[in-house]
Amino acid sequence: MTLLLRWVLRVCLVLAASIVLYVSVTAVQVWLTSRQTSENHANAIVVFGTAEYNGVPSADLEARLNETLALYQLGRAPLIAVTGGKQPGDLYSEAGVSAAYLHIHGVPLSKIVVGGGSDTYQNVQSITPGLQDRGVKTVLVVTDPFHEDRAMAILTTFGFSPSPDPTTSSPITGWATVPYFAKETIAVSAGRLVGYGRLSSTSHPSNP
């Protein structure tokens, strides 16, 4: 083996080890964040959308919305922002279904900021103007535990100060969360390196 080949092999091994270490540390951080719950008050609650079925919230979305209602009813924040767009062929957006659910359960429409978006970055991007117009700086973040780290990181890039309040009644539990934690670890690892905005543009090139 030539000296050059040995050097190349050594560099490759160091690079591979660095990548494994970086992803491993990120995985631990995503997991640790998932276990955090704040007791803070804030200017607004941001609840991230997920699947709806013909205008009816999925079990996961309903769990997030019920967590949001509990926080709102406790007076933890006076305003709620809902997010999530439409899947191809859908009649309703995730945000629209969320807003309707909250309103039916007693939240005035004037207290709901409706956004959209195809991913977490676009979700936050869609609600930022409405929140900024109302002077919102601090937010409580309602989503599944495994999604908290990325959601809060993106909210921070838009100038908000987030606190975690993950749903405690998600239907995704136990071993079923493993692929979700893996996905979030990859997304956070990539987002930190290239930027969440660039990652979103790559994933959804036709969207702003």
List the predicted regions and their residue ranges.
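A structural signal for short, hydrophobic/glycine-enriched beta-strand patches
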Residues: A27-F181
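Short, highly charged low-complexity linear segments
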Residues: P78-L79, A182-V188, S206-P208
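Short, surface-exposed patches at the edges or C-terminal ends of soluble domains, predominantly
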Residues: T168, Y196, H204-P208
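A transmembrane-helix-recognition feature enriched in membrane-embedded lipid enzymes
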Residues: A27, G174-S201
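N-terminal type II signal-anchor transmembrane helix
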Residues: T2-T37
